[in-house]
Design a protein with these regions (language model features):
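Glycine-centered tight beta-turn/hairpin loop motif at sheet-sheet or coil-to-beta transitions
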Residues: 104-105, 132
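Short solvent-exposed strand/turn elements
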Residues: 122-142
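Short, positionally conserved secondary-structure boundary motifs
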Residues: 2-78, 87-92, 106, 116-121, ...
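Short beta-strand-centered aromatic/proline hotspots
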Residues: 94-98, 109-115
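Structural motif
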Residues: 80-81, 97
Length: 159
């Protein structure tokens, strides 16, 4: 009587062995991680480009950065790779949008909100972390919004 025996072969990722698109290999798109972005206080971006492969091409004006810090947890964990879209001109994004803010000395990733200043009574834009252990950046004067958060990469491989 014949018995089935396990084959001894190197492990191959299931997505490669059994592609999700019936009979077609999964497409991958190469892109560069262009640097790091702080999720904490403003910090200078260290540019350490490296290549990754992801399941979709980057759109026009999109780029990938690595998040450093815990101020956007749990939504965007420390060390995550995120896709950002360049933001170059008015209007200011809608409140609630996660943005890349650059004050000329450093960049940070925060949620953009509007609220009334208790002292002046004026409504102002504020950069708010998602993690309540971190403080808001107020006011948002002297800098600009340079990018809009699009998504956190989950399915990618290092080059």
């Amino acid at each position: 009587e014949r018995q089935l025996r396990p084959m001894h072969s190197p492990l191959v990722p299931l997505v490669r062995q059994f592609p999700s698109h019936a009979g077609h290999a999964r497409r991958e798109y190469s892109t560069q991680i262009i640097g790091n972005i702080a999720a904490g206080s403003l910090a200078e971006s260290d540019t350490v480009p490296s290549t990754i492969y992801m399941e979709r091409p980057l759109g026009k004006n999109e780029y990938v950065v690595r998040v450093e810090g815990k101020s956007m947890e749990p939504l965007i964990p420390d060390g995550s790779l995120v896709i950002m879209r360049r933001h170059t001109a008015p209007p200011i994004p809608k409140p609630g949008t996660i943005v890349e803010y650059n004050d000329g000395r450093g960049v940070t990733l925060k949620k953009l909100i509007r609220r009334k200043n208790a002292e002046t009574g004026k409504t102002e834009y504020v950069l708010q972390p998602i993690n309540p252990a971190f403080k808001d950046i107020t006011p948002m004067d002297g800098g600009s919004i340079s990018g809009i958060y699009m998504e956190t990469l989950v399915n990618y491989r290092k080059g």
